């Protein structure tokens, strides 16, 4: 069964207090780089996989998309999206992205923010996206970096005084399920290598345009713990085009 942690009331409440949940795209440390990878939305049909609060759906509409479909497994996420970002041309649909069925060539742009590392069968999803996109269509997504997902618990190693020593990277080439800790709770994620992310895209007809390991923006460097984000990559951004 696909995990839906975000409909747990206590977990969702903690998520809602995160900086990015409160401040949206401008509160996301990778947004300044992710935005650079996005294509022109003018007149485009856009699909957002794992749309969450709908921030990216609203962004696409503000940039003159013709139609936006935002899908998410979480009822609570979509309720918030509809409250914050309702629009006649934005449709929100509750479904796991792995279960989504759409007509071939039905979208011009597909994007996804920090959701694909929750997907067990990445290759099957890439196949579906290639089918849904028109020729020349764009797929842009962010995931947790393979360095960040490899070990599992996603926490630093500390000394006896609680000072950070280093970040563990282990079992890198053993892809598959990890029991991560997020918001003090155990969450299932799926680790895969950088090679798998990129080669799978090329195998299914995508041309790689950009690969970015985003650094935190300067204006966030004084936030608690942000300087430590320079010690290892946390996120990976990829932009490709269907050829």
What residue spans do the PLM features occupy?
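Conserved class I S-adenosyl-L-methionine
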Residues: 1-41, 55-59, 80, 84, 139-176
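Class I SAM-dependent methyltransferase SAM/SAH-binding core
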Residues: 47-49, 53-100
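A short acidic, Gly/Pro-enriched loop at the edge of an enzyme's catalytic core
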Residues: 98-110
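A short SAM/SAH-binding and catalytic strip from SAM-dependent methyltransferases
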Residues: 108-123
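A short glycine-rich, Lys/Arg-flanked "PGG" loop and its adjoining helix->strand segment in the class I
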Residues: 123-138
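Acceptor-substrate binding/catalytic loop of class I
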Residues: 143, 147-156, 181-196
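Short alpha-helix
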Residues: 177, 188-212
């Amino acid at each position: 069964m696909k995990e839906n942690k975000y409909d747990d009331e206590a977990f969702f409440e903690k998520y809602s207090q995160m900086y990015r949940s409160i401040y949206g795209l401008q509160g996301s440390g990778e947004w300044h780089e992710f935005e650079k990878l996005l294509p022109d939305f003018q007149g485009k049909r856009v699909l957002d996989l794992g749309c969450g609060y709908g921030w990216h759906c609203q962004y696409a509409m503000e940039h003159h998309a013709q139609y936006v479909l935002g899908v998410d497994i979480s009822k609570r996420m979509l309720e918030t999206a509809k409250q914050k970002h309702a629009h006649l041309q934005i449709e929100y649909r509750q479904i796991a992205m792995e279960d989504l069925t759409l007509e071939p060539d039905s979208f011009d742009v597909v994007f996804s923010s920090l959701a694909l590392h929750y997907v067990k069968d990445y290759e099957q999803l890439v196949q579906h996206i290639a089918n849904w996109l028109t020729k020349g269509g764009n797929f842009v997504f962010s995931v947790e970096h393979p360095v960040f997902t490899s070990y599992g618990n996603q926490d630093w190693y500390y000394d006896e005084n609680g000072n950070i020593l280093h970040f563990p990277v282990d079992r890198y080439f053993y892809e598959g399920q990890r029991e991560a800790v997020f918001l003090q709770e155990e969450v299932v994620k799926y680790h895969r290598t950088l090679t798998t992310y990129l080669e799978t895209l090329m195998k299914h007809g995508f041309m790689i345009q950009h690969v970015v390991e985003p650094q935190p923006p300067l204006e966030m460097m004084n936030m608690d713990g942000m300087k430590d984000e320079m010690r290892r990559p946390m996120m990976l951004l990829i932009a490709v085009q269907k050829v």
